[in-house]
A protein has these predicted regions:
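Bacterial N-terminal signal peptides
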Residues: 8-18
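Feature marking well-ordered beta-strand scaffolds used for ligand recognition
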Residues: 19-566
């Protein structure tokens, strides 16, 4: 739901003339030592630490969305959130769950809709629910057997559209296929077009075969002007006839950018990767070099490549030793094509070929694009044809992941998902500007860097932790944000002064396991109608409320609760 991370401009300041009146009577200093350090590990009953927030409820996943025997099962990762009325829709790599939040202290399950295919990033507009599909196992019919064939008419990569007029019984009314699938998407409204909504699709998968989806091309633009590279898709959805949704255009918002260097991995990660690669090779595993480090390739990726080799020789059955040898010979080239696009004219390495996520602010005609190697500022006054007006890069950023505007659009915050989200990147040895937020001021089509913000509490090597999704809290006259940091928990911070962001509240749990990294933590934390709602990857759904402190008064909290979304 990153597209909804902005708070619409509302005239609420006048309702809160005394907002700051009581906070000075309460302590403002954070507890020392930090209670987040050294928390006891466990799955459902890990030790907890909270400061200036109260945990209202924790609701475990429904039975269809949990593997009791394997808490780290990636097939059941809880992902992003979307809201409508009293309901929250929680995406999951296995589908989505709808929870009734009428009683925040006890959310109740409305429906568990099984539909495998990551990430199931979700958004809602009135009675329509949109879900992103990118994984090769996603099927049009949402069944669970996957798609074993390399090319298949049964595969879904793109956007699923559901009618949730009866929210207990979502009805799939349309699927829009795209060439790179949909890792995330953003719903955009056009003030001049009330008959339609638009979806900006960010796909990060390799380009599909044209044998599976006609017209898909992975060639560079100088070889094929209709290349899918360096573009996003814009889908138009008729509100009266969503079944007619279609790709309207493919603006090349990344064209013309050149590759930028990022920092190397941390020394301990380089050493660990080398050790793991050596062990894998000794056991017959498959490895490849990515950004200077040898990595072990997963069985799913290897299996798909071997299947392709078998089919290319018109064979059947299991891959042979000859097939494995052929893959070893070709593997580095295959990985290079995925990770490093070929050089453009003149041998210049191009910049990123896709965006990860786009956050829109239609009221001011701007969007923030987080696009791997760059952060973009987009002009979206013409919603159907967004245009890049500024781009920033930073060698401290490994992967530009998401963006959040402040309320008046004078600032934008970008996150860096260094390590991809399932690695420990908040260790005491990790630099504070790596895997952090970068805050920029915005003026006259220019973004100017101001500072970094990173979760200040060090986490263990067994906790995946890095900057992830969050939203503004609508406190008048201030820029306050809540953000998920995976197993770093949630952090609430004040970035009203963009050069000096300050943490003012937090919640954290101990790791899932005290001996190894098991993925978990807050995928996203959003303010919604007076509460903070967090999607916990492995533990379910958390609901919090702010408590008055030396940083936020009760009057300010009450003013924020006056902002109500439907």
């Amino acid at each position: 739901m990153q597209s909804s991370s902005f708070i619409p401009s509302l005239a609420i300041a006048a309702l809160c003339a005394a907002c700051a009146s009581s906070k000075l009577d309460l302590p403002a200093a954070a507890p020392k030592p930090d209670p987040r350090v050294g928390l006891r590990a466990a799955w459902m009953n890990a030790a907890e630490a909270a400061w200036n927030v109260r945990l209202v409820s924790t609701t475990p996943p429904s039975e269809q969305f949990i593997d009791h025997s394997n808490p780290g099962n990636y097939e059941f990762i809880n992902s992003d959130l979307a809201f409508v009325g009293n309901y929250v829709i929680q995406g999951n790599f296995h589908g989505f769950q709808v929870w009734d939040l009428s009683r925040p202290s006890r959310p109740t399950l409305v429906t568990a809709y099984v539909c495998p295919g990551s990430q199931n990033d979700v958004s809602v507009y009135h009675n329509l629910l949109f879900a992103s599909g990118e994984a090769p196992n996603g099927r049009i019919d949402c069944s669970t057997q996957g798609v074993p064939d390399t090319v298949s008419k049964d595969r879904l990569r793109g956007i699923r559209i559901f009618d949730i007029s009866d929210i207990a019984h979502p009805k799939n009314v349309a699927n829009v296929q795209t060439c790179r699938g949909s890792h995330t998407h953003t719903v955009v409204t056009d003030p001049n077009d009330t008959a339609n909504v638009y979806i900006y699709v960010s796909g990060s998968a390799p380009v599909r075969s044209p044998n599976e989806l006609v017209g898909c091309s992975a060639l560079m633009p100088d070889q094929d002007p209709n290349s899918e590279l360096f573009r996003i898709e814009v889908i138009q959805v008729s509100l009266a006839h969503p079944e007619q949704a279609h790709v309207l255009g493919k603006p090349a918002i990344l064209a013309g950018l050149t590759a930028r260097q990022s920092h190397a991995e941390a020394p301990e990660d380089i050493a660990a990767a080398a050790k793991a690669a050596a062990e894998a090779r000794a056991k017959g595993g498959f490895t490849a070099t990515v950004h200077g480090a040898e990595i072990v390739l997963g069985p799913g990726f290897v299996g798909r490549q071997l299947d392709s080799i078998v089919k290319a020789r018109q064979g059947t059955g299991a891959p042979t030793g000859v097939d494995s040898a052929a893959l070893r010979t070709a593997l580095q080239g295959i990985v290079d094509k995925i990770v490093n696009p070929p050089s453009g004219p003149g041998g210049v390495r191009p910049g990123p070929t896709q965006c990860h996520d786009i956050t829109v602010y239609p009221a001011i005609g701007l969007a923030g694009g987080a696009c791997g190697g760059y952060g973009l500022l987009l002009d979206i006054h013409n919603v159907a044809d967004p245009r890049r007006i500024a781009a920033v890069a930073d060698s401290n950023f490994a992967f530009w992941h998401s963006a959040t505007f402040n309320n008046d659009g004078s600032k934008v915050l970008f996150t860096d998902e260094w390590g991809g989200g399932l690695q420990a990147r908040c260790r005491p040895t990790d630099k504070p500007e790596w895997g952090a937020d970068a805050i920029f001021t915005v003026a006259h089509d220019t973004m100017t860097f101001q500072s970094y913000y990173k979760l200040p509490a060090p986490q263990t090597q067994f906790e995946n932790c890095v900057a992830h999704n969050g939203s503004l809290i609508p406190i008048p006259g201030r820029d306050i944000m809540v953000q998920g940091w995976y197993q770093g928990g949630i952090s609430v911070f004040d970035w009203t002064d963009p050069a000096h962001p300050t943490e003012i509240a937090y919640f954290d749990r101990g790791p899932m396991d005290s001996t190894k990294l098991v993925g978990a933590g807050s995928w996203s934390a959003y303010w919604y109608n007076g509460y903070i709602v967090s999607s916990e990857i492995a533990r379910g759904l958390d609901v919090f409320e702010l408590v008055p402190s030396g940083f936020i008064s009760q009057n300010e909290i009450d003013a924020a609760k006056l902002v109500h979304f439907e």
